[in-house]
Amino acid sequence: MQAPPRKPDVSGGPFRITSIETQKHDKSRVNIYLDGVFAFGLPRDVVIQQHLSEGDEISEDLIADVLLLDELSRAKEKALAYLSYRSRSIQEIDVKLKKKGFSDRTIQQVVDDFIRVGLLDDRAFASAYVQTRMIQKPMSKRLLKKELYLKGIPETMAGKVIDEIYEDRTELDVAVSLAERRFSGKVNIKEQKIRKKISDFLARRGFSWEIISEVLMNINSK
């Protein structure tokens, strides 16, 4: 786990802001000097928002507030970067930010803000996840529910989303289609060895023995 940035020792005060300098490697952040000594870095937006200027006095309470705003800003940047690869569930964002060392309070604020603006939506995430799965790696409803559960999606929500994506297809339809696509062109698909491979393959995709046996009977009747 990555340790959170060390909090500066700014107990006591009030302090005088003696310098605000743009950071060399990140123009969106500035270094704050109190009484001639470097104290901490902040996003430029926070400095503007809090009307901080050189020569101002700053209290211990205000320092605590701006450091919380800084943590929130950094947490949102991490979350946005994580979301840039693909959509995420609320639980995935929570776990990722915890690993980065952010506080529960900050993580909850990020989640609340992202939900409010539509960047986090567990139902939309679940729907996109299931659609992608059914295109790239079709599987049983049970296995889909398990995968969504591991990503923090409630069982009821997962069930509704999966039923919507499955539409008029049954699990048997999906299993038969999978078996035919995977094992088409085999010399003798009725051969015991091939039938065992079909059974194992469908079991790995989460299908029940009842479904698998129906698939095998379907193949046997052809």
Where are the predicted features?
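An alpha-helical, amphipathic repeat domain used for nucleic-acid recognition
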Residues: 1-222
